From Swiss-Prot:
The keyword Transmembrane helix does not apply. This is Formamidopyrimidine-DNA glycosylase. It catalyses: Hydrolysis of DNA containing ring-opened 7-methylguanine residues, releasing 2,6-diamino-4-hydroxy-5-(N-methyl)formamidopyrimidine; 2'-deoxyribonucleotide-(2'-deoxyribose 5'-phosphate)-2'-deoxyribonucleotide-DNA = a 3'-end 2'-deoxyribonucleotide-(2,3-dehydro-2,3-deoxyribose 5'-phosphate)-DNA + a 5'-end 5'-phospho-2'-deoxyribonucleoside-DNA + H(+). Belongs to the FPG family. Involved in base excision repair of DNA damaged by oxidation or by mutagenic agents. Acts as a DNA glycosylase that recognizes and removes damaged bases. Has a preference for oxidized purines, such as 7,8-dihydro-8-oxoguanine (8-oxoG). Has AP (apurinic/apyrimidinic) lyase activity and introduces nicks in the DNA strand. Cleaves the DNA backbone by beta-delta elimination to generate a single-strand break at the site of the removed base with both 3'- and 5'-phosphates. It comes from Herpetosiphon aurantiacus (strain ATCC 23779 / DSM 785 / 114-95). DNA binds at residues 94, 113, 154. GO terms for molecular function: 8-oxo-7,8-dihydroguanine DNA N-glycosylase activity; class I DNA-(apurinic or apyrimidinic site) endonuclease activity; damaged DNA binding; zinc ion binding. The gene is mutM. A zinc finger (FPG-type) spans 239-273. GO terms for biological process: base-excision repair.
Length: 273
């Protein structure tokens, strides 16, 4: 599933293509369940001739703000892609939503697994989303003191705590592994067992791995692409995730795969002991 760096990379590419443009018409909605707030007919009517004001991100969600104060919230889930292409470019069978733009291009949603969702909401819908999410780890409201307080209230293991979107918004399996490796913390440690120095190390590690991945335009393992269909490059810079059996770049010990909270997890058994 795309995590914060991937969704931020998509956001930036969509921003270049969409801000100031108009949704002209819904060309097709091949899988109606993708839009979970409106029928196809009402959705088509609601977005027609609406100008795009901003493209923002909250956690793993894209927020496309329209000129009538409504917002299209897009959750890519496992395999969703938001692509902006020429209208004459052929669409394959996994393209489930096509929206015409006023410059002759199209916004397309490509999703082989069909788990992605579009929700057209008013301001209260955006507020409800914000209310259930924790702070943005690259935002000003992510402070060391607040992070320490949140961890102190959690007796759960640190790995699933980092994946809890009400604790921290946007971190998923890849970057939890990467941050814990960088901070030299074992993922099975209880969140409330970390001392002040460990919390500070993890706080900085989370920001570092996310910023580095954004710089590399995200991690493409299978499906992730930006709005131009381009892959990310962060998969070539991972330290722990997906590197089972390969040497730890700090100590040379083979990276091991374990399961934590039913999630595949990658650790250095020496550095993170």
């Amino acid at each position: 599933m795309p995590e914060l760096p991937e969704v931020e990379t998509v956001r930036r590419s969509l921003e270049q293509e969409l801000v100031g443009r108009y949704f002209v018409a819904l060309r097709s909605l091949g899988w109606p369940k993708i839009v979970d707030t409106h029928s196809p007919e009402l959705f088509a009517e609601a977005i027609a001739q609406r100008q795009i004001q901003q493209v923002q991100r909250r956690a793993k969600y894209l927020l496309i703000e329209l000129d009538n104060h409504e917002t299209l919230i897009v959750h890519l889930r496992m395999t969703g892609q938001m692509l902006v292409v020429a209208a004459d470019e052929p669409a394959d069978r996994h393209t489930h939503v096509v929206v015409a733009l006023d410059n002759g291009r199209e916004l397309r949603f490509h999703d082989p697994r069909k788990f992605g969702r579009w929700s057209l909401v008013d301001r209260s819908g955006v507020a409800a989303l914000n209310q259930r999410l924790g702070p943005e780890p690259l935002g000003d409201d992510f402070t060391l003191d607040d992070f320490a307080q949140r961890l102190s209230r959690k007796a759960t293991k640190i790995k699933p705590t980092l994946l809890d979107q009400s604790v921290l918004a946007g971190v998923g399996n890849i970057y939890a592994d990467e941050a814990l490796w960088l901070a030299k913390i074992h993922p099975l440690r209880s969140a409330n067992s970390l001392n002040a120095n460990e919390i500070a190390e993890l706080f900085e590690a989370i920001k570092t791995v996310l910023r580095n991945s954004i710089e590399h335009r995200g991690t493409t393992l299978v499906n992730y692409r930006d709005a131009y269909g381009a892959s990310g490059e962060n998969q070539y810079h991972l330290e722990a995730y997906g590197r089972t059996g390969e040497p730890c770049r700090r100590c040379g010990t083979p990276i091991e795969r374990i399961v934590v909270a039913q999630r595949s997890t990658h650790i250095c058994p020496v550095c993170q002991a």
